[in-house]
């Protein structure tokens, strides 16, 4: 049996402020730092170890992973970073308060932008200062790869490309893998692994800072999945209500 651990980064400063974050490189809040330390302690107490780790190129996911590995005394584990594990790009919504955006455009429209699989939010203009195509972390992107906006399908496409090329082969060679990433990135992976429909993924929430374990067979088909706490397995319905989605 193969085990894969997925974790959404700890609460970020913009999670706390209820802002659309996307590719904006926002750091963890104090609570997010605590969530990351707790996640590391949970994984260590439950006997987990890792051979390789994957994360995005955004500091909230990177820092979460660093803290987890530090808490587990696994700072030596190789870490691979890729923009393909970044959060969904929210286009012109990035930086905006979600409640204020709902008042401006209507709750139904904002819900469609956030939860539908194939509707993109308004795109950034190329002269928008939020369009960070010159950021050195993206210098290897081919022309046209840097998004102005994304729907969940766009995110899923790049995430699964990376999954099949990089992560799945590691799992198939019996490497113990942890992925520290983002809400929509992990939703994309869960949708793929569990064969969820577009409608099925709409209501899927991934809590910040709580390890999600997938037990997989030799073909990487899920046997079961569960969240972890200090006492071991915990089902989704028992996740603490205070967690910010």
Curated annotation (Swiss-Prot):
Domain of life of the organism encoding this protein: Bacteria
Keyword check for Isomerase: yes
Pathway(s) this gene product operates in, as recorded in its UniProt entry: Carbohydrate degradation; glycolysis; pyruvate from D-glyceraldehyde 3-phosphate: step 3/5
Keywords annotated in UniProt: Gluconeogenesis, Glycolysis, Isomerase
Gene3D superfamilies given in the database record: Phosphoglycerate mutase-like
Enzyme class per UniProt: isomerase
GO MF: phosphoglycerate mutase activity
InterPro entries named among the record's database cross-references: His_Pase_superF_clade-1, His_PPase_superfam, PG/BPGM_mutase_AS, Phosphogly_mut1
Enzyme Commission numbers on file: 5.4.2.11
PROSITE patterns: PG_MUTASE
Site (Transition state stabilizer): 182
Catalysed reactions listed for this entry: (2R)-2-phosphoglycerate = (2R)-3-phosphoglycerate
Record keyword rRNA-binding present: no
Record-linked HAMAP family: PGAM_GpmA (MF_01039)
Function per UniProt: Catalyzes the interconversion of 2-phosphoglycerate and 3-phosphoglycerate.
Family statement: Belongs to the phosphoglycerate mutase family. BPG-dependent PGAM subfamily.
The name this protein goes by in its record: 2,3-bisphosphoglycerate-dependent phosphoglycerate mutase
Native organism: Bacillus cytotoxicus (strain DSM 22905 / CIP 110041 / 391-98 / NVH 391-98)
Gene name tied to this protein: gpmA
């Amino acid at each position: 049996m193969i085990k894969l651990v997925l974790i959404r980064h700890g609460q970020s400063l913009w999670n706390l402020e209820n802002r659309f974050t996307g590719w904006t490189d926002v750091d963890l809040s104090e609570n997010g730092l605590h969530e990351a330390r707790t996640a590391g302690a949970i994984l260590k107490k439950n006997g987990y170890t890792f051979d390789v780790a994957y994360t995005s190129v955004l500091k909230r996911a990177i820092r979460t992973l660093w803290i987890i590995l530090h808490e587990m005394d696994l700072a030596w584990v190789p870490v691979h970073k890729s923009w393909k594990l970044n959060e969904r790009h929210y286009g012109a919504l990035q930086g905006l308060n979600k409640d204020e955006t709902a008042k401006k455009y209507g709750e139904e429209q904002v819900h469609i932008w956030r939860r539908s699989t194939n509707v993109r939010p308004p795109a950034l203009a190329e002269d928008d200062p939020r369009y960070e195509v010159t950021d050195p972390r993206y210098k290897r992107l081919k022309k046209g790869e840097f998004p102005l906006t994304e729907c969940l399908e766009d995110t899923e496409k790049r995430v699964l490309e990376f999954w099949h090329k990089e992560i799945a082969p590691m799992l198939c060679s019996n490497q113990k893998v942890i992925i520290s990433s983002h809400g929509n990135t992990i939703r994309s992976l869960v949708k793929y692994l569990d064969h969820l429909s577009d409608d099925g993924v709409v209501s899927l929430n991934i809590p910040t800072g709580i390890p999600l374990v997938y037990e997989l067979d030799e073909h990487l088909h899920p046997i079961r999945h569960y969240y972890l706490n200090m006492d071991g397995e915990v089902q989704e319905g028992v996740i603490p209500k205070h967690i910010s989605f």
